[in-house]
Amino acid sequence: MKNIAILGDSLIGLLSALILSKNKNNIYIFRNAQEDSERENIERYFSINLLSKYMFMKSGIWENIESNGIQPYKKIITWNDTGNEVTFNSRSISYDYLGYIIKESSIKKAIEEKLSKLENITIKSIEEVSCIDQSENNVINFINKKKLKYDLLLLADTRNFNVFNNLEINRITHDYNQSALVINLKLENSISEKIAFQRFADNQIQGLLPISSNEFNLIWSVNSSEVDNLFNKDKVLLTKILNDQLSSRIGNIIKISDRIVFPLSGFYVKSYVYNNIILIGGSAHSVHPLAGLGLNMGIQDIFILDTALNHEKNTYINEKSLNYYNNNCIKNNKKLFYTINFLKKFYENELLALSIKSKALDFFNKSLILKSQVIEEATGIKMLNSVLSEGYSRPNNY
């Protein structure tokens, strides 16, 4: 049996624990310090792609999540104010859906219920840790002077970097100079077809995720200098602004929720492995939310790690398996990082003539091959089919 420590109880940390527990390892989860109570009281939604669904099914939590309500969608429609439109359809890759909108609380509850039934899971608080020093040969030091020797340590949250004495992480960063305003919108009428929308306008991006038959979750990315103005507007005025921008697509908005704001920044690490310490999920990368891939990228990290370790069943954790994880995470996440940044810059570039943008978007929208390739990347189908010999199919629960 191996000792695996996971710093951070984010969704990525918890799902990592569940996936890695299957080989009867001793799993130690170190919960983060309590978060801001205001953020805790606001429900978050995620767009889950097909690779993430596969991992939820493999870990045996999909049926639990599904029973608490999900919103599948078949189409994504993007448009800008000059009239250009691009439509992505699940038919392009011969699947029923492109993704699923799921509450964060539903995912977390399903994982925690599964973990609570496992005897090889130990929950601790990160506040119990005094320091972790690589020179001490894979040991976690506790405030009470006790020690825990680990075979593998997963760092799943950037908030926990401070417990390391000598861990230097090299990162490539990108300042988007934007913040995201998150609001739930209630419509006057129901929409029969579940579609995710995205509107590109001057220095702003509005992503709309269907969360019920007459509600959308709006992620509104705007320049940081403008976000306070929007945040402080009264609900009546803000509803009018949103109706002017969005009602032609989703219908009349009659009510909006309270709103939250969070800053946007991008980064990726140059290496995911530091001896027996590995970075995963939010500790390793952050991207603009325009593609809705943040959580999915973290779950893809777990998929790659699980694949790497299961390729080495005899020794399980060794240099070869960790190199596999490191190399594949670097290759895939770096590509996604720069692709997302390119798309953002393309839509915002005022120096690029509108006629050129229009022709490029029209060509792309008519190219079934190009769109299919993009969809396969974004949904994780390409990754699944490249690794699984049988292709993407329903895995056995365990």
State where each predicted segment sits.
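Active-site flanking residues adjacent to catalytic metal/cofactor-binding acidic residues
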Residues: L7-G8, F30-R31, A156, G281-G282, ...
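Conserved FAD-binding catalytic core of PHBH/FMO-like flavoproteins
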Residues: F56, L152, A156-G251, S257-R259
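Glycine-rich FAD cofactor-binding loop and adjacent beta-loop-alpha segment at the N-terminus
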Residues: N3-A5, D9-Y73
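C-terminal helical "tail/cap" subdomain of flavin- and related membrane-associated enzymes
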Residues: T307-Y398
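Conserved N-terminal helical subregion
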Residues: M57-K58, W62, I70-N166, H174-V182, ...
